[in-house]
Amino acid sequence: MTDSPQPIQLIVGLGNPGDRYAGTRHNAGFWLLDELLRRHGGALRPERRYHADLATLHLGPHQCRLMRPQTYMNRSGQAVGPYAQFFRLPPESILVVHDEIDLPPGQVKLKQGGGHGGHNGLRDIIRALGNERGFCRARIGVGHPGHRDGVVPYVLSRPAPDERRAIADAVEELADCVEWLLAGDWGRACQRLHSRS
């Protein structure tokens, strides 16, 4: 994390569109967008030129855009890249929210910059931003199946009730921190989220 991160202007929740994938671990980014809209109102509307549904979030004195790509996960850059380019968004002002198999259910970690860590959605966004890796990430833990051969069916399935509750609790806590992220107060958000057990 840098000492003075940019205020977030765009929150991108990653997932796969369609009822088949609703509630799956891979759609953890969508879970956050749903929680923010439930709390603060608004509705996502299709924007075909960006291959995404978009909404504006008003939170205190701050506002930002919410994006739910309507591409499949592996093509998330088709939504994020053109939007960031058109509005000239610095990568540091973009928060990408995604599932993280290397964290247990119930944990959330914030990170600024870095590689894709094998996550195909992040890989495609990095490619679409011209190999720019400086965008921010909120990594929502969904747990690991125990062996790499089981990762794809695991993330594309729905969690057991106890895991679902842990992930939902983490999403709610991340939603509590969004106003700080919009203000650029990463230290406060990290202190709260990274102290979760």
UniProtKB/Swiss-Prot annotation:
It holds the Pfam family Pept_tRNA_hydro. The keyword Transcription regulation does not apply. One of its GO terms (biological process) is rescue of stalled ribosome. CDD domains: PTH. SUPFAM superfamilies: Peptidyl-tRNA hydrolase-like (SSF53178). Its EC number is 3.1.1.29. TRNA binds at Y21, Y72, N74, N120. Belongs to the PTH family. Hydrolyzes ribosome-free peptidyl-tRNAs (with 1 or more amino acids incorporated), which drop off the ribosome during protein synthesis, or as a result of ribosome stalling. This is Peptidyl-tRNA hydrolase. It comes from Alkalilimnicola ehrlichii (strain ATCC BAA-1101 / DSM 17681 / MLHE-1). The lineage of its organism: Bacteria, Pseudomonadati, Pseudomonadota, Gammaproteobacteria, Chromatiales. The gene is pth.
